[in-house]
Amino acid sequence: AKDASLWTDTTEAQWLGWLDIVPAQLREVGRFAGIAHAVQERGFTDIVLLGMGGSSLCPEVFSLSFGQIAGFPKLHVLDSTDPAQVLSLERRVNLKKTLFIVASKSGSTLEPNIFKQYFYERSGRDGSRFIAITDPGSKMEQIAHAEQFAHIFYGVPSIGGRYSALSDFGMI
């Protein structure tokens, strides 16, 4: 019934999209498999997810829970601005064989944008090795088009970041 009063009496009604996400995503299972195989076919050995908070927590939990699947790239999550962690991650991957996923609902979150710019420069400004996951109409969508990212996946605007685990933010 999407009764927002069960949670709060504020603006919660505009953030209840997570209640419908499971059936919607179940219809997309083939799309997710296709993405995985396309990434595999391109020969990537690593995937670095660049995000903060809700945009990166679920992928990190999935990675830690299920590990790497044989024959597919290893997932690394960068959600720290500590320069030592950024450099440590950079040293663990072959940048020429790494796919970068920039995850930001608003597209204007400072940390993922800084991470994106750093690795975009370090990878020779090759947008074909970047994917964006962002809400429609965001600044990140504009950047992804301008820099010719390989793909843009869209979040559901009615799902808040902390509830985005079962949307494309968690599933891609």
PLM regions and their residue ranges:
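Extended, charge-enriched "interface" segments that sit outside catalytic cores
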Residues: 1-41
